[in-house]
Amino acid sequence: MAETAVINHKKRKNSPRIVQSNDLTEAAYSLSRDQKRMLYLFVDQIRKSDGTLQEHDGICEIHVAKYAEIFGLTSAEASKDIRQALKSFAGKEVVFYRPEEDAGDEKGYESFPWFIKRAHSPSRGLYSVHINPYLIPFFIGLQNRFTQFRLSETKEITNPYAMRLYESLCQYRKPDGSGIVSLKIDWIIERYQLPQSYQRMPDFRRRFLQVCVNEINSRTPMRLSYIEKKKGRQTTHIVFSFRDITSMTTG
């Protein structure tokens, strides 16, 4: 039986609101759980500076003590997680597909490294990064096309693919916390950068779909179900339906 998440609604309400452009939600990239956690904190820092600004210097900091407090770690564990995750950002890029630039089967895209600098100050107990300035517009000055959720909604998720799926669902979440969205399997594999073996439906179902749905149901305030949509004998889409546990208990 899946573990049921214990949701503290007051803490959830007071938790930082993570807001990012839908372009970033739909982008192709692969990050670890700890890298995703840091990205959430960076997004929060950038938007707290002034959500109306069109420019930001891109310099963000992570205090070891604060990170440890947020994610329930010791200082040593937090410092190790931060150090390893930041180091592993090297060589990783985020890809934004540009359909208007497509030519035949060849896709148009823009690809960016996440950071242009990272630093560590042991004497102050903090790490800092300089986010690629080309990425700043995806975090600030957002008008209509954005995805939002509370940090507390995702902090217990351990699977980075479940984090990506949760963001995709939140992109289509209604004000009452419910939603239905159909995602193409090929799109999920491409944008979440899943292993090539997941193109086989049994592997996709067992290693991605079931694992992520179970984790979201047990570790977030979302209650999620799905059906597989077929074209002939081939499964092509996954249709997700979800509700927020708050609406389920108060509605």
Curated annotation (Swiss-Prot):
Which Pfam family, just one, is annotated for this protein?
Rep3_C
Q: Which positions make up the DNA-binding region?
A: 75-83, 200-207
Q: Which SUPFAM superfamilies match?
A: Winged helix' DNA-binding domain
Record GO terms (molecular function): DNA binding; DNA-directed DNA polymerase activity
**Record keywords: rRNA-binding included?**
no
According to the record, the residues making up region (Dimerization) are 1-144
Keywords for this protein: DNA replication, DNA-binding, Plasmid, Plasmid copy control
GO biological process entries = DNA replication initiation; plasmid maintenance
Record's family?
A: Belongs to the initiator RepB protein family.
Annotated function:
Replication initiator in the monomeric form, and autogenous repressor in the dimeric form.
Subunit structure, as described in the record:
Monomer and homodimer.
Question: What is the protein's name according to its record?
Answer: Replication initiation protein
* Phylogenetic placement of the source organism: Bacteria, Pseudomonadati, Pseudomonadota, Gammaproteobacteria, Enterobacterales
